[in-house]
């Protein structure tokens, strides 16, 4: 996938079904993609990184190595 689309927190929450607190807790633990700081007051996530993270979780569930 070569998707450069950026998404905001509400979309990340919708895609993952996580709360804001869970997303930030996973980021702090290094277990979820970090947001990209766009301006002093605005951040977004790479949609591609979110989908890659989901694919990684599926692989872990299925016993895959990738």
Where are these regions (language model features)?
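Polyanion-binding surface elements
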Residues: 1-25, 49, 55-57
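C-terminal end-helix/capping segment
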Residues: 43-46, 51
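Major-groove DNA-recognition helix of helix-turn-helix-type DNA-binding domains
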Residues: 15-44
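Short, structured secondary-structure boundary patches
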Residues: 43-44, 56-59
């Amino acid at each position: 996938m070569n998707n450069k689309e950026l998404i905001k927190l509400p979309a990340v929450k919708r895609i993952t079904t996580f709360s804001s607190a869970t997303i930030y807790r996973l980021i702090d633990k290094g277990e979820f993609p970090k947001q990209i700081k766009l301006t002093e007051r605005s951040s977004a996530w790479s949609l591609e990184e979110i989908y890659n993270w989901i694919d990684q979780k599926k692989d872990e569930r299925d016993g895959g190595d990738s």
